[in-house]
Amino acid sequence: MAIRPYLDVTPTLGPGAWVDETAQVIGRVELGADASVWPFVLIRGDVNVIRIGARSNVQDASIVHVSRPHAGNEAGWPTLIGEDVVIGHKVALHGCTIHDRVLVGIGSIVLDGVVIESDVMVGAGSLVTPGKRLESGYLYVGSPARRSRELTSEERARIPKMARDYVTLQRAYRDGGHS
């Protein structure tokens, strides 16, 4: 795995967190307990902080970055990801906040200042435009992403289950099993 410092700040990994050897995790990045970072992911906390909560996963070929502080936005946009979050393959996250139990579908893009409340699904290929707030309990789809419908109770239960399944899978990889 490539855990690299930036300006003398090295990423921190919580207990049981796992980073694939092909991934790059750079700078001010904190991974919570049992979080996982999958092949060919880039997480770059150079000009702001990135926090990824417990049991959350960032899947293959995704990019997570931040925005620097600037006039009119003294804090910039960190990227903050809650617990039990599933970030699908080839997702781009930039300077956004994602609360707990969220699924961001394959190929989606989430931009600066976006807030995704807990218990949300973002459909594959969606574009969440800057500053948008996605309310809890709904599926959002499209470009730009729009509220489509309420999540079913089964869908709400599926998100933390997927996060737990990825914890089990990352443990198998970490322990040398590839089946």
Task: Map each language-model feature to its residues.
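C-terminal segments of enzyme domains that contribute to small-molecule binding surfaces
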Residues: A2-G16, D20, A71-A92, D100, ...
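Left-handed beta-helix
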Residues: P15, D20-E21, I26-G27, G32-A33, ...
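A short beta-loop-beta micro-motif enriched in histidine and acidic residues
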Residues: V49
